[in-house]
Amino acid sequence: MRNKRISIKKVIFYICLLGLIILLVMPILWAMLLSLKTNNEIVNSPLSLPQTIRFENYQRAIDTIDFSKMYFNTILLVVISTFFSILFTFMSSFAIARMVFRNHKASETLYLFLLIGIGIPIYVLLFPVYRIDSLMGILGTRLGLILPYVAVNISFNTLLFTGFLRDIPGELEEAAIIDGCNLFKLCTKVVIPVMKPTFVTIIIFNAVYIYNEFPFASTFIQDNALNTVSLMTSMFKGQYSMDYSGIIAASLMIMLPELVFYVILQKYIISGMTAGAVKG
């Protein structure tokens, strides 16, 4: 009777799991079907199978978009912004979690202040950051995007870094200091290797966010030569029409690299997100 009850629970669990998988995969499969249709088919019968498979939609997307330039611009922003965001937030998180403050409330206040950004919508920041970039003379440049990208990731990075750093046994650091490690060696030789899953998780989340980011890019980029992949939809807009099949085909091509990147490193995401969540 017990085995029968367990088997029923398993069946229900797997049915729910299958339903969730279908729910998550269906939009991608639907987009793949739409990318093989004509614009008329997409507008008039979006749920039907394509009457004729049209791979030329992908060729048109390649001809319309300068993928090499857009990928270069995007990857450059991703690498620089992610590097400095991680550098600054790791140092601040290490100070909050591991260094002794005379006033404990001061460190907690600083920590909470850094976490405030999690609850601030990106669109609220557009106008203030636009004004700051304009006053600094960096509006329309890569630096004008790198600075806000670094800033908006501070709260999330601090949350993960501080949570993991507080879970590292103090004896590990004490032993390293007794062996002659200074603060720099303590971080690079002891702490960072232990935090590898957390670092990989933060790199992935920061990189994927910047790769897909649209509000800042669409507002601050004023030169087509600096366009990122998130702005490719503008290439398919006419004055009175829109190339839906071209947009969908290009979107799938742009999504593929980050999907592969995520699948390869997914085990680090799970271990990194759970790091610090369980004591002992």
Please provide the spans of the model-predicted regions:
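A hydrophobic, multi-pass inner-membrane permease signature
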Residues: 1-280
